Amino acid sequence: VEKPEFIEFEKVCRNGGILLEESQRNQFKDYVNLLLQWNSRINLVSRRSVENIWTEQILHCLAPWTVVRFPESQRILDLGTGGGLPGIPLAILRPDADIVLLDSVRKKTDALREIVKALGLKRVSVATGRAEELGRSAEFAAAFNSVLARGVAPLEELIRWARPMLARSSRVKVDVRSGQRPFLLEGSTLIALKGGDLAGELRAAAVKTGERDLEVFDLPLLDEVETGLEGKKLVVVRFSWGKTGPV
């Protein structure tokens, strides 16, 4: 018998155009069970969100993909992944993507390796380290098409950390207002799930990093259910690789 929380989760996904196959449904259920088991020993997600894990964690991490989408076979970094969020939900949704889960806390990454193995996510790997240091390493420099971040740091810092890890790609200006949703992400991008005073954060990021192509999107999937995620937005940064390119 399906739990009511999962039934509601799947209904919201379906209404938002996310249709899950049976294997994906099972992976999501297994992931939540593993996350809860590990969370009793290691703080992978906040204790207060455990009660509403399907909405406050999983649904939040799927919400961006009703607004934007990646091309096929992308290499993506989940920066400051914590409990594998948003990287693991994306990996379940998009098994064609190569995803690296990065966190600086070894206890978390050790747990994530076990979770990834148990879920059979063959194209997901886990790394331990700090983004500001790994961006200078041969393994991580210019290695990714996109960087994801969820509630990790101010946008200005995320841009600085992401820039050296992104492969240079010609920027394509997309008219998102006339395009069909979810619109295709082009070029090198930072995808950040954010909340709070975004106006000030966006201004500071543009001034201090020189990146000007920053766009904010609502997450309509979250309006389908009562959550503690009111005011959450998606920020997409398309890197210019002009004077603001990697140094």
What label would you give each PLM region?
Residues 1-73, 77, 107-124:
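Class I SAM-dependent transferase core
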Residues 13-15, 39-40, 85, 129, ...:
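Residue-level signal for pocket-adjacent positions within structured domains
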Residues 80:
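Conserved glycine-centered beta->alpha loop in an early N-terminal alpha/beta scaffold
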Residues 83-96:
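Conserved SAM-binding loop of SAM-dependent methyltransferases across substrates and taxa
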Residues 96-100, 104-247:
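S-adenosylmethionine
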